Amino acid sequence: MGIKSLYQIISENAPDAIKAGEIKNQFGRKVAIDAYVKTAQRYRASTDEEQLTNESGETTSHLMGMFYRTLRMVDNGIKPLYVFDGAPPKLKSGELAKRTMRKAEAQEAAEEAKETGTAEDVEKFSRRTVRVTREHNAECKRLLKLMGIPYIDAPTEAEAQCAVLAKEGKVFGAASEDMDTLCFAAPVLLRHLTFSEQRKEPILEIHLDKVLEGLGMEMTQFVDLCILLGCDYLDPIPKVGPNTALKMIRDHGTLEKVVETIESDPKKKYVIPDDWPYLQARDLFFNPDVRPADAPECDFKWTAPDVEGLVRFLVEEKGFSEDRVRNGAARLTKNLKSAQQSRLEGFFKPVAKTEQQKATAKRKAEEKAELAKKKKKEDAKAKRAMGAKPRGAR
């Protein structure tokens, strides 16, 4: 789920934190990728018309997505490192239960749509029933090993592990669609990196330092804002939308002060849920269960693919095209050996500002100009006062 409306807040209040570019612009970079998001994306992109299973009826869409989208990244000079989720924190159990319920409801709706609805209805509800299993993850790990692409298992949250690897300089950034990756202090969040080429979505670089600068916040305030917006650990406070949440943190500075203000309000405009352990949520963001970047498990490297192993697994066991698999292996061998070249940061351009963003920027510029004008007047007044003092006065 990530953080509700966080991208909207950043795009409106810190637009310079977001840069858009093509996948080729990531050339020469090592990137830690949230493997759950990557695996699930392929499922959600699949439709009934695509070949989701082999002749034996086994699901192969997760392997197809992992193989071809990884090839696309390597073709563009990216060195991917996949990070798989471990056990979720206990505080996340509520969100996971909701997801299970939503999938069950979607399954019922999909079955009903098959009887009475359109093909679009069937596809829409079928996508919501996606569930990545341990077997899917195990097969993806086997595939990555044969491809020569490294992966690690996170103790808990994959995005937290991606963030610490980026923070410690082991990789350039963390690739995930979950905005809460920024709450774990990832210096750079890459969105849409693992989308298929057909999606034609630009790769978004979101820089944490620019986010904090644009919002005028320290990291603790930013995390408090994200908790107030609603995250995987806690639901948002009823009736507190993104603009209200932003104003509350700016006005009061901390969640403690926000909670105190809400609870002392005689009108009871907002009501904090009985079970709302925001201190625990904050601690999970600042002290996640992750492997240190210098741990042996994080000493990863990229190797040449096992071509015959790939053929045995993908062709003989899973029914893939041998020509395509061998061609993909050749691309891996060639591109993983490619010498690193200098990067041109000019590849990226700032995201075009919306009318609302332009209006916000104009307002801030006017406020800044007004403050400068006021200060100039005060300085001139002080100077005149000094000049008006009688001679000999001290």
Curated annotation (Swiss-Prot):
DNA binds at R69, E157, G230, D232. Residues 383-394 have a biased composition (Basic residues). Residues 1-103 are annotated as: N-domain. Phosphorylated. Phosphorylation upon DNA damage induces relocalization to the nuclear plasma. One of its GO terms (biological process) is DNA replication, removal of RNA primer. Its main location: nucleus. Residues 121-252 are annotated as: I-domain. Keywords: DNA damage, DNA repair, DNA replication, Endonuclease, Exonuclease, Hydrolase, Magnesium, Metal-binding, Mitochondrion, Nuclease, Nucleus, Phosphoprotein. It is found in: Nucleus, Nucleolus; Nucleus, Nucleoplasm; Mitochondrion. Binds 2 magnesium ions per subunit. They probably participate in the reaction catalyzed by the enzyme. May bind an additional third magnesium ion after substrate binding. Its EC number is 3.1.-.-. It comes from the Eukaryota. Structure-specific nuclease with 5'-flap endonuclease and 5'-3' exonuclease activities involved in DNA replication and repair. During DNA replication, cleaves the 5'-overhanging flap structure that is generated by displacement synthesis when DNA polymerase encounters the 5'-end of a downstream Okazaki fragment. It enters the flap from the 5'-end and then tracks to cleave the flap base, leaving a nick for ligation. Also involved in the long patch base excision repair (LP-BER) pathway, by cleaving within the apurinic/apyrimidinic (AP) site-terminated flap. Belongs to the XPG/RAD2 endonuclease family. FEN1 subfamily. This is Flap endonuclease 1. It comes from Arthroderma otae (strain ATCC MYA-4605 / CBS 113480) (Microsporum canis). The gene is FEN1.
